[in-house]
Amino acid sequence: TNALRILGAGSGLFVFFGDALKGYFALYLCDSIVAQTETLLFVPSDYLFLSLIFSFIGHCYPVWFNFRGGKGAATALGAFIFIDPYFILFPLLGFIFVFLIGRFVGLATISAFFVLFIQTFFIDHGIHHNLHAFSLMIFLCILFTHRSNIQSILKGTEIKL
């Protein structure tokens, strides 16, 4: 959202897709490496979720920028698209619904990741047995990275898009 506001729509979308691809390819590379490994300490899907968590943390707190990065939503979105592209349908609908009502991107993002977490209780995940825990972790991280947005909304100073 910051790139969109500062640089305009074209550059903002470029940054958004770049961040989403970062999350997607982090899991893609992890999956490729794990598939070639004979001895594993964890279940293969756990490596994907650990890759998700670390790509999210690396995006939010990059060493190269004095640990000041983005809020991680697009990176997490890309990772969840890798896990299952259909898995983001309801969160996307939740995002659109909340955004159209309030015009707050931060609130819509928080809502989308809450929907993502809630839907893990209703969808069969096959090999992704820890999806509940990791989607909760990502939701809590999204809440943490959006805490300034939450404070601004409560104060009435959040900028609508």
Please name every model-derived segment:
Residues 1-11, 69, 151-161:
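Cytosolic, membrane-interface loops and tails of multi-pass inner-membrane proteins
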Residues 27-28, 64, 100, 117, ...:
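Membrane-embedded alpha-helical segments of multi-pass transporters/permeases
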Residues 11-17, 21-63, 86, 95, ...:
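Nucleotide and nucleotide-moiety/phosphate-recognizing core
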Residues 129-161:
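C-terminal membrane-associated helical module and adjoining short loops/tails
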Residues 2-8, 30-34, 54, 72-102, ...:
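Interfacial segments of multi-pass membrane proteins
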Residues 62-68, 97-111:
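Membrane-helix interface "capping/anchor" motifs
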Residues 89, 105-112, 127-136:
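Loop-to-transmembrane alpha-helix initiation sites
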